[in-house]
């Protein structure tokens, strides 16, 4: 029995030493140490031995198993280390290879236009002011001379949080807050998002961008308003652009007007974009209503001022010839990569 155990032990160790793959070692383990393995079978057959032989044979079998297991574990570790090293060698990075080209982002046409407009007004001495998009009724309507029964207050046009709080429908509340917190002279613009209860179509969106401007000082006239906006139009669209002012009505300015510019597409000749009129509406403007000045603690007998407002999305569409406002908000890279 002792000789047989020695032969099995030597055979197992020899096969282990000759193995070069993990699956080969697993086969050896099953062959000698598994439930039906040769060394395990000897242990199970000890019932047929005499009481005197059992302790000796049991000791010899366990010693043989221990040596085979030790050799097996060592071989398994060695093969795994080798396989790992080979895998790592195959995955080595060639640092001489060129790297992947990074995709460079681009500015959105809305951002480009806003930045362009801001730069023009800042160069003219305007400051940029900001305010909350969730606004009190007082700042959005009351302080701007928009009475309780005004159509702009209806739920068809305005998104209400509650009776006293709305999503601002214009950036004019920033002008009110600025007049409350700063003493004249004031020369500011207020770009930002505004909200209306509109259905989405080619020319309407419930969220869009506005830029409004305000100038308050002693002796400010409508001529100052015209000169400021005409200069802006030339800087924005080129020296050849012409402008004209039409009478209009806004509750927060008096007198009020709308400014048109010669069509950027046809140069005033008439086309589909300008509906063959040669002119495109750019903005609303006017002299600040005395009631608005009083509401903000400014004496209209001493100070006067003018205000104006652009739809920035509209400016983008006019400047780049875009005929659907939805393109500005759909994040379609085929569209955005054109800018």
Swiss-Prot record:
CDD domains: PheRS_alpha_core. It holds the Pfam family Phe_tRNA-synt_N. GO terms for molecular function: ATP binding; catalytic activity, acting on a protein; magnesium ion binding; phenylalanine-tRNA ligase activity; transferase activity; tRNA binding. Mg(2+) binds at residue 254. Gene3D superfamilies: Bira Bifunctional Protein, Domain 2. The keyword Transferase does not apply. Its EC number is 6.1.1.20. The keyword NAD does not apply. Binds 2 magnesium ions per tetramer. It comes from the Bacteria. NCBIfam families: pheS (TIGR00468). Belongs to the class-II aminoacyl-tRNA synthetase family. Phe-tRNA synthetase alpha subunit type 1 subfamily. Tetramer of two alpha and two beta subunits. This is Phenylalanine--tRNA ligase alpha subunit. It comes from Clostridium botulinum (strain Eklund 17B / Type B).
């Amino acid at each position: 029995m002792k000789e047989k155990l020695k032969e099995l032990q030597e055979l197992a160790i020899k096969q282990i030493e000759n193995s070069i793959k993990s699956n080969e070692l697993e086969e050896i383990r099953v062959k000698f140490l598994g439930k039906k393995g040769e060394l395990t079978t000897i242990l199970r057959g000890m019932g047929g031995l005499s009481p005197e032989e059992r302790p000796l044979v049991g000791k010899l079998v366990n010693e043989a198993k221990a040596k085979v297991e030790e050799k097996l574990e060592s071989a398994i570790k060695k093969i795994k280390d080798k396989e790992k090293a080979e895998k790592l060698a195959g995955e080595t990075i060639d640092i001489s290879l060129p790297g992947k080209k990074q995709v460079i982002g681009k500015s959105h046409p809305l951002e480009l236009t806003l930045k362009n407009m801001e730069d023009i007004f800042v160069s003219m001495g305007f400051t940029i002011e900001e305010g909350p998009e969730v606004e009190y009724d007082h700042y959005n309507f009351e302080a701007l001379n928009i009475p309780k029964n005004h159509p702009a207050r209806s739920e068809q046009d305005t998104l209400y949080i509650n009776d006293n709080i709305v999503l601002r429908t214009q950036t004019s509340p920033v002008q009110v807050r600025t007049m409350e917190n700063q003493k004249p002279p004031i020369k500011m613009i207020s770009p930002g998002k505004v909200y209306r209860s509109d259905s989405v179509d080619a020319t309407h969106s419930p969220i869009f961008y506005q830029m409004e401007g305000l100038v308050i000082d002693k002796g400010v006239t409508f001529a100052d308003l015209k000169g400021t906006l005409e200069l802006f139009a030339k800087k924005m669209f080129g020296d050849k652009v012409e402008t004209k002012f039409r009478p209009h009505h806004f509750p927060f300015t008096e007198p009020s007007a709308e400014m048109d510019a010669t069509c950027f597409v046809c140069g005033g000749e008439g086309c589909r974009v300008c509906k063959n009129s040669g002119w495109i509406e750019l903005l609303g403007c006017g002299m600040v209503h005395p009631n608005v000045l009083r509401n903000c603690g400014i004496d209209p007998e001493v100070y006067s001022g003018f205000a104006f407002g652009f739809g920035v999305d509209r400016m983008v569409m006019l400047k780049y010839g875009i005929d659907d406002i939805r393109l500005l908000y759909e994040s379609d890279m085929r569209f955005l990569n054109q800018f």
